[in-house]
Amino acid sequence: ETTRKPVLGIMECGIFTALTLGQRFGVIAILQSSIARHLRTIITMGVQSRLAGERAIGLPVIELSDESKTLTRMIGAAKALRDDGADSVVMGCAGMAQYRKRVEQAAGIPVVEPTQAAVVMALGRVRLGW
């Protein structure tokens, strides 16, 4: 289907937001198998030269509710991406949202939750009359 209304993808909005926070960004994926899909989007967007890396935490969406395991792995991934040169990190799954602030505090770099980024961009478009 086609529409004349704007369509904002959460991954794209998350990456665009991350690019305003520094030169290079990283992505935290849920599974290794998610990375190829993310890379296709990053390449299509033309921003692969600014990707510091992507790390998978090895948990399917259903297991993200295990707070201890998820938070530990996400913090480890964010710190590794920071050490790889990322100035900010994008969460690769909307199911990670509840961990954003704690991961950001532990890693010491901005962490972008892509659904929040998309909502803010959509609100901006509305306010600008687009």
PLM ranges: what are they?
Residues 31-92:
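Active-site rim beta-loop-alpha module in soluble metabolic enzymes
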Residues 80, 85-109, 125:
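Extended, histidine- and acidic-residue-enriched regions that form the cofactor-binding/catalytic faces
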Residues 26-28:
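Conserved beta-strand elements of the Class I
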Residues 123-130:
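C-terminal helical cap(s) of enzyme catalytic domains, especially alpha/beta-barrels
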